[in-house]
């Protein structure tokens, strides 16, 4: 069915692509990634767009003091929209291309932001956040795949990790905007903050006219000339004879030939015997990322710091520091993910996060006292103001937890889920499925965390600590290493059922040509093709004579 849809829309898709190509393109891979990963910045704007306001008096008064259940649904409504957006993304991305999907992402985001900025009641706020969420869902499913398809293999991890960096940058920018605008009395504070969300959406929308289409998608549409030109301009300043370019084109051809010779690919294919292990690995990678508890820190940090004894501006300032930590620590992570590998970072990160979750639970459990008159039923405990050391210990656990996440699971999962398939035929749909799992867990965590704080307070962190232990165990036994491996190697590793803990040192049973060997082979084939074309042209001229 999916292949039929792609064939039906192939003509219109190429016309749309021609229209998008009217403006000159920029082929610097970092510029391209910076435009596409604005979708990640929008994801970040979503995460912190509520954080600075949920404890503010004017917010509580305007929305009639929403209880833990209502506030949970308001916060989580964007994740609900993102779930549906991520599922729908492949129905646009496959037949119409990656750029149109990013344009769709920007459109929904801007419409949702406009609705939020003109909010009159809770229902309108929820509707606006759901619509923006659809856009974020499109972007979170498409942008990592688009980056992986365009990036040279040697910096694939870096380019893939830029998505998470832009997420953290968006979180920080939005929180500080909200913090500054929070000094305005009345509803203008959050109206302006939510209206400013239109800016990154507009930048993404306009930027899509200056970046090229995915060469793999173009090749699939039979546009080989355009595909080769894009690969050459990105990897070799336009030199089509460059070995890296020849290797990349060869890999694309091999993948498409394999796709032509196989049965139709759809969502059901992901759950066949060949792919089901990869599918569940990618799904659990996204599930575990949410179950670290990171978004509890992002969405409800103001609540957490109230429990630690902070209030007013001191709460917001202390809260903002973790967003700076999140952004700054992500930068070296982009480098180390290609040096250290995926597995060591994920296992080490889960272990550290477990320790800090248990540490935070222990401090709050030991030193907090009941706080029945807090004015917020989600915050019913508090460390006394005279116990500064306990407060600082709780805050330190939060900061160290955020740093541990940013350096490991924050960057690592988006890179890993784009690589793990080892087969471009299923990568887009697989990424859409795994990303939808991320969003449904995001929704559940944002929805039920206030209720968890209300009913079990500090014990909530014990639950997330246990999840961190479980994910470290799962990564060790179930997540193979993908660092430095070509798509064919990753696919072969799955087919040979290599144990995850042996994947780092694994060598292909069926030898795969080295880059140098493949380059020599491609050069020979390229010369043979040129000679055949010359012979064909000579015969044609002789016949005409």
Swiss-Prot record:
Major subcellular location class: membrane
Gene Ontology biological process: carbohydrate transport; cellular response to heat; cellular response to neutral pH; D-glucose transmembrane transport; filamentous growth; filamentous growth of a population of unicellular organisms in response to heat; filamentous growth of a population of unicellular organisms in response to neutral pH; negative regulation of complement activation
Subcellular location: Cell membrane
Record protein name field: High-affinity glucose transporter 1
Superkingdom classification of source: Eukaryota
Membrane topology: Multi-pass membrane protein
CDD domains per record: MFS_HXT
A family per Pfam: Sugar_tr
Function: High-affinity glucose transporter. Acts as a multifunctional complement-evasion molecule that causes down-regulation of complement activation by acquisition of human complement factors FH and C4BP. Also functions as a human immunodeficiency virus (HIV) receptor via binding the viral gp160 protein. Modulates hyphae formation.
Keyword terms: Cell membrane, Glycoprotein, Membrane, Transmembrane, Transmembrane helix, Transport
Gene Ontology MF term list: carbohydrate:proton symporter activity; D-glucose transmembrane transporter activity
Annotated organism of origin: Candida albicans (strain SC5314 / ATCC MYA-2876) (Yeast)
Phenotype when the gene is knocked out: Reduces the binding of human FH and C4Bp as well as of human immunodeficiency virus (HIV) gp160 protein onto C.albicans cell surface. Reduces ability to form hyphae.
GO terms for cellular component: extracellular vesicle; membrane; plasma membrane
Signal peptide boundaries: none
Sugar-bearing residue positions: 376, 387, 455
Signals that turn on the gene: Expressed in presence of 2 percent glucose. Expression is induced by progesterone and drugs such as cycloheximide, benomyl and chloramphenicol.
Xref: PANTHER family: MAJOR FACILITATOR SUPERFAMILY (MFS) PROFILE DOMAIN-CONTAINING PROTEIN-RELATED (PTHR48022:SF7), PLASTIDIC GLUCOSE TRANSPORTER 4 (PTHR48022)
InterPro entries cross-referenced by the UniProt entry: MFS_dom, MFS_sugar_transport-like, MFS_Sugar_Transporters, MFS_trans_sf, Sugar/inositol_transpt, Sugar_transporter_CS
NCBIfam families: SP
Subunit and interaction comment: Interacts with the human complement factors FH and C4BP. Also binds human immunodeficiency virus (HIV) protein gp160.
Family: Belongs to the major facilitator superfamily. Sugar transporter (TC 2.A.1.1) family.
Stretches the record annotates as Disordered: 524-545
TM annotation in the entry: 29-49, 72-92, 100-120, 125-145, 157-177, 192-212, 291-311, 317-337, 345-365, 395-415, 433-453, 460-480
